[in-house]
Amino acid sequence: MLKIGSHVSMSGKKMLLAASEEAVSYGATTFMIYTGAPQNTRRKPIEELNIEAGRKHMELNGIEEIIVHAPYIINVGNTTKPETFQLGVDFLRMEIERTSALGVAKQIVLHPGAHVGAGADAGIQQIIKGLNEVLTPEQTVNIALETMAGKGTECGRSFEEIAKIIDGVKYNEKLSVCFDTCHTHDAGYDIVNDFDGVLNEFDKIVGIDRLQVLHINDSKNVRGAGKDRHENIGFGHIGYKALHHIVHHPQLMHVPKILETPYVGEDKKDKKPPYKLEIEMLKNGTFDEGLLEKIKAQ
């Protein structure tokens, strides 16, 4: 079974149930959530996440596994502000606890961190330090380090940087990788013409068994731009053909694929989610040039 879905919202009283209902309405077989707002530390207690009803709904609809994304405010790469580093460590511990409580997520996607001017090597050492403070041999969920675009002072912009982090962490069996198509393209990897070559390179440097999550996004920018601006499937510089190839790649069939493409529409208050039609299009093998108009008309 193709495990494909999108980022969905866990909100209101329904929480996990709302997320599962939204995912099912898109024809998804997996989905990704934040356990609270990605930009702040406000979190509902675990008992208010409506886990039992959410899991029941998932089971009825054939969804076995979901992905959690850690909030953006976590930056364990910060060497200049001890309080930012500490917040990242404490918050990541809490996210592991919350994800474990869900019982249906094995991976927490984490942006490795930004060195905020101290240099990539210093940032990587700080990320290693942070992960060593957080990871325990008993935990049941992995931290999936996301491949980054190289915007600003981001660490994790190359497979070598990801490998360096993994190699420095004591309990690194608890680390995996989230391969983001927009980010790797923007970082300079040629996933359009030679995805198999890029995957082989990843395998040599990191190990393909670590690739446990895929973020499927097109890119608004040319390869190597270091920008990280997502585009709808087939409407960017990666293109439908390459993304369809990645989604159906025989070596990655077991990996959950998550769309984080932008909502569609000119009116900021009335943008429409693209995921139902994008998922259909990635399943059926034919690019639809009129897709954005169809999404707007939903």
UniProtKB/Swiss-Prot annotation:
Names of required cofactors: Zn(2+)
Record-listed E.C. numbers: 3.1.21.2
SUPFAM superfamilies in alphabetical order: Xylose isomerase-like
Reaction equations catalysed: Endonucleolytic cleavage to 5'-phosphooligonucleotide end-products
UniProt-listed GO biological process terms: base-excision repair
Binding site for Zn(2+) 2: E146, D180, H215, E260
Keywords: DNA damage, DNA repair, Endonuclease, Hydrolase, Metal-binding, Nuclease, Zinc
Binding note for cofactor: Binds 3 Zn(2+) ions.
Chain residues that bind Zn(2+) 3: H183, D228, H230
InterPro entries, per database record: AP_endonuc_2, AP_endonuc_F2_Zn_BS, Xyl_isomerase-like_sf, Xyl_isomerase-like_TIM-brl
GO molecular function, one term: deoxyribonuclease IV (phage-T4-induced) activity
Protein residues bound to Zn(2+) 1: H69, H111, E146
Keyword Mitochondrion: no
This protein's record includes keyword DNA damage: yes
A Pfam match: AP_endonuc_2
SMART domains found in the cross-reference section: AP2Ec (SM00518)
Domain of life: Bacteria
Function: Endonuclease IV plays a role in DNA repair. It cleaves phosphodiester bonds at apurinic or apyrimidinic (AP) sites, generating a 3'-hydroxyl group and a 5'-terminal sugar phosphate.
Family: Belongs to the AP endonuclease 2 family.
PANTHER family: APURINIC-APYRIMIDINIC ENDONUCLEASE, ENDONUCLEASE IV ENDODEOXYRIBONUCLEASE IV
Protein name per Swiss-Prot or TrEMBL: Probable endonuclease 4
